[in-house]
Amino acid sequence: MSKRPAGSHMEHNDLTDASIIRIPPHHYIHVLDQNTNIARVEVGPLTYIRQDNERVLFSPTRMTMVPPRHYCVILNPVARDDEGHVQFDTAGQAKLRHADLEIRLTQDPFPLYPGEEIQKEVTPLQIVYPDTALRLQALLDFEEESGEKRVAGDEWLFEGPGTYIPRKEVAVLEIIKATVIREHQAIRLRARKEGVDRSGTRRVTGEEWQVSKVGAYLPGAHEEVIDIVNAFILTDKRALHVRALRPFRDAGGRDRRTGEEWLVTVADREAHIPSVAEEVVGVVDVTTLNSREYCVILDPVGPDGKPQLGQKRVVKGERSFFLRPGEHLENGIQDVYVLSEEEGLVLRAVEAFNDTEAQEEDEEEEEEEEQAKKTSVQRRPGDRWMLRGPIEYVPPVTVEVMLRRQAIPLDENEGIYVRDIKTGKVRAVIGHTYMLTHDEELWEKELPPNVEKLLSTVRDPLADRSEHNQNAVAEPRDKTMVVSYRVPHNAAVQVYDYREKKARVVFGPDLVMLGPDEQFTVLSLSGEKPKRANVIKAICLLLGPDFCTDIITIETADHARLQLQLAYNWHFEVKNHSDPAQAAALFSVPDFVGDACKAIASRIRGAVASVQFDDFHKNSIRIICSAVFGFDEKLAVRSSLRFNQNGLVISSVDIQSVEPVDQRTRDALQKSVQLAIEITTNSQEATARHEAERLEQEARGKLERQKITDQAEAERARKELLELEALSAAVESTGAAKAEAQSRAEAARIQGEAAVQEAKLKVEALRIEAEAEMVRLAKAREQELLYKKELDHLEVEKQQKLVTIESQRFKQLVEAIGSETLTAMARAGPELQVKMLQALGLKSTLITDGSSPINLFTTANGLLGAMKAPE
């Protein structure tokens, strides 16, 4: 059955059973003959009378209308003859081309015969715009109107602009749009099938090529666009690194092999579009060197364009270049070595070459200015030499820069340790600026840990000598600098040379600078109270005078054990500092403090052991001094004690405290001391008490006498007070009345004066008010007169101007109308009245009374009944 609108069938379902069916124009119905079972088409306009053996299959349906530029597809179309008429079989049924399609374009409305179906509704024809195309494929073998034969499976393009008329043998695969190729662009194409491209070149399946012509490119039926390739814009600062994917000839006409790499620069072309046989490895930026830069290129490309593997080339600025494929920089761009007079370079030859920039130094290395001359020197691999400034140096590929040396400035009291790497000899350079040669290096001098600690501690050996137990701030030491030590005043330092095996003593104030093989003699002295060994570590020996304190324990003849705290004043006695023997004797006793304290303690113990406690308690200083210093030939106590080994002299002894060691002795001594203090205190207390009692008696007598004197004075004062009170009462009674009368009179006088003053003030106020009112009225009248005067003046000016304006208006009016016109206007009225009276035929008529005057001027107006215009 043919396709019909479902809604129409349901809406007119009742019409199929009617006997009379009215078919409008451009409508049709299918009528089924139930006897022959054959359906036919009835087309309107028609009033169809249905027979009993017929059945209308559907209500009237609108014919199919194909507007212009539209088409539809009919399935199972009817067969037509050469003239386009429908063919019927012997039974009267329309013949159908089953399973066939028919595309119908714009035509008159047509009905669908039984068996026909609309496979595709009315659809607009496809418009192919410019730069677009339809890729078509043949479904059946056919021959086009132009005579070209198509085989099933063939593909071709229908290019615009145009309207595509569909065929049943052709299927539209896709719409192809042209690719716009802009400036510096290309499109990469691939052949989907063997054929000829638009330029006429034969292409095989899978072959790729590029089209770079500016404009729109429409790919062929067997071409596909892989990518749009943008050109690389080449400048003076950018180049392109390209690799060949297969053998080909590049745009410059050179044959390239597979894997070959090269650079495309702006010298070749300004914009480069990589071809299908090229691969872009990367963009290479320009390498720019200024006048103070250089670089070393590894594996440089030779004149033949091939990398020279293992070789180097030095390039110095000013220059700009591109690194070619395979080349790379060693350590990047480097600065040219610009050496001043105080700088130098240690160089080493990596291969044999003839050096034309060598410098030969004079043999005297102490001179500050070293002369040099350019010669040709044959260098062998491994040779080391030094290049001194001032110079600007770029090392060649045969030279390696080992070190950059700079002159080390040294003061008179500064130095460095220098070691010759060839001989191993170490020496100290002191007091002048020095630059190491190519065979020298700085040597680090190692010191014992205790010496390092003493040197790195920022501590004054004289002022901070008692702070040996505190943690001092340590500063790191430069081991290549000459070790120096400032010897303070009245001190000595011993330095021992292990290579020469001799020592030297330096007295302060002076500066000690150690040689490479010299070391300080470290003093290890006893300290604290009582003395302990190895407490104080020191480099310098203080010569004094100074003191040391020690605590010793002694025992008397009666076995009383006492603890003494003694302070000794000491100093070293050196008569000649230049005498090496005397100077060396100072350091002959490593711990002179401990030895001296032990010797003195031994003497004191021996002397006290033969003395009773009471005698020692009373004569302790004499006993200790005699024990320490001894007696001379005259049996007098010596003034000092001298140790001949190192020249130490003990000049005095101070007993700071004496305490018993035994507790019972300490308690008994304390008790006796307390008893003596108590007796003395009681005696002083009794004396003070007697003196206080005497003073108290004297004070008490003075107090009684003072009391009697005060009572007499009080009675005398009371008498005077009573007399004054009586006199005051009399004066008070008399003065009260007098004062009251005086006050009343004074009040009346003041009141009268106030009334008079008030009256005067009121009169003055009224006078002032009256004068002010008169002044105000005068001002007001004056202003009012001025106002009236101005108004009158303005009114006069107004009337004058109005009269002038009116006269001007009348004058201009008269001038505008004219004298003749005015004469005519004046005569027009009377002449009209005369003519009207003449028309009435009146000769002369006068009717009046005696009391009414006659006005001949208005007679005509009265006769004619003219109305006087209201004013």
Curated annotation (Swiss-Prot):
Q: Where is the composition biased (Basic and acidic residues)?
A: 687-710
Q: Which UniProt keywords apply?
A: Cytoplasm, Nucleus, Repeat, Ribonucleoprotein
Which top-level group of life is the source organism from? Eukaryota
Annotated InterPro entries = Band_7/SPFH_dom_sf (IPR036013), MVP (IPR039059), MVP_rep_dom (IPR041139), MVP_rep_sf (IPR043023), MVP_shoulder (IPR021870), Vault_2 (IPR041134), Vault_2_sf (IPR043179), Vault_3 (IPR040989)
Its cellular-component GO annotations read: cytoplasm; nucleus; ribonucleoprotein complex
Instruction: From the Swiss-Prot or TrEMBL record, state where the protein is found.
Output: Cytoplasm; Nucleus
Give the region (Disordered) as residue ranges: 356-381, 684-710
List all Acidic residues biased stretches.
357-370
Any Pfam family hit? Vault
**PROSITE patterns listed in its UniProt record:** IQ, MVP
Give me the MVP repeat coordinates as residue ranges.
2-69, 70-124, 125-177, 178-230, 231-285, 286-336, 337-407, 408-482, 483-545
Residue ranges of domain IQ in the record: 688-717
Decide whether keyword Cytoplasm is in the record: yes
Show the disulfide pairing: none
Main role?
A: Required for normal vault structure. Vaults are multi-subunit structures that may act as scaffolds for proteins involved in signal transduction. Vaults may also play a role in nucleo-cytoplasmic transport.
How does the annotation summarize its subunit structure? The vault ribonucleoprotein particle is a huge (400 A x 670 A) cage structure of 12.9 MDa. It consists of a dimer of half-vaults, with each half-vault comprising 39 identical major vault protein (MVP) chains, PARP4 and one or more vault RNAs (vRNAs).
Can you name this protein? Major vault protein
**Gene of origin?**
mvp
